Amino acid sequence: MRLPITIATLERRAMLRAITAASGTALSSALLPRHVAAQPASGAAAADSGHFEMADIKTGDNTIFIRRYGKGSSPLLMVHGFPRTSLMWRYMAPSLANRHTVICVDLRGYGRSGVPASADDHYPYSKRAMADELVAVMDKLGFSRFDLVGHDRGGRVSYRLALDHPEKVQRLAVFDVIPISEGWGHADAKFAMTYWPWILLSQKAPLPEKYLSGAPGAVFDNPFGQGSFGPEVRAEYTKTYRDPARVHAICEEYRAAATLDIEHDNKDRDESRRITCPMLHLWASGGPLDTLYEQDGGSLGIWRKWADHVEGEAVKGGHFFPEENPGETTEILTRFLSA
């Protein structure tokens, strides 16, 4: 009888591939640590032999779910975007754990993290509120300063964290996004057709909630949401969109992006606040960022208006290249973090 494949098994295999690639040696899966089953952690942590842990971290009135890889001397926080969860880092985190303590979080409203109530102005789901919460998570874990990587919405939370808490961030890497105010400021028909979640999910409730809840898996069938994953991972991702409270939270985050987040960006620009730590920007080769902003020197040119020390390059793959091409992505990121 064929046994069902669990998310924990998939992460175990990802770790095996990462270790094998790094060492050039084929390893038996029996030599790898046993992973915790894919279920919500109870208490402070649910740990195995030390290579992979899951925990619920209390942050005031909310709880943030984390996956923790390794025990390296340099802490690294990794933040997913829409429509993913911390599971998107399953290929990269094991390799990065050779040198880092890697903390992969589920943002509030996503995955297994809590779903705090929103407000009329959407502030609880602004990038500022989400960034503040991640600082609280890292403080709880004992990390006063850390490297930071974010993809998609997680990239926007990450650059906001670097602007609001510059003393916390050693190095910043932002994958396949530009600042929120720049995105809206450059918006045209091509932008709307490409980045449809910006337009749809920011509409007044309950319209977008009804669309997402009515077809929870549809976002993963659209080219924007497709990526390199099998049915087990798809099922794990889709769980978020079967929960009406989480769907509302995600829409609230997009509403904040169309209002408060723009205000916060504009205030930074007016006050000449910039990202001062070393920054890496990666984007998908042949993806929208490769062509939408050519008049500005590409997305890298846009980031140079916001950051003092930024470098970047294109990575083969689509928007979800951390999953589609984790080897090249990890290699570039490791080089940046080691500089």
Region locations from a protein language model:
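N-terminal secretory signal peptides
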Residues: 1-10
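N-terminal twin-arginine translocation
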Residues: 9-17, 25-43
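Flexible "cap/lid" subdomain of the alpha/beta-hydrolase fold that forms the substrate-access gate
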Residues: 44, 50-52, 62-64, 75, ...
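Conserved HGGG/HGGXW glycine-rich cap/lid loop of the alpha/beta-hydrolase fold
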Residues: 69-115
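Catalytic histidine-centered segment of alpha/beta-hydrolase-like enzymes
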Residues: 318-326
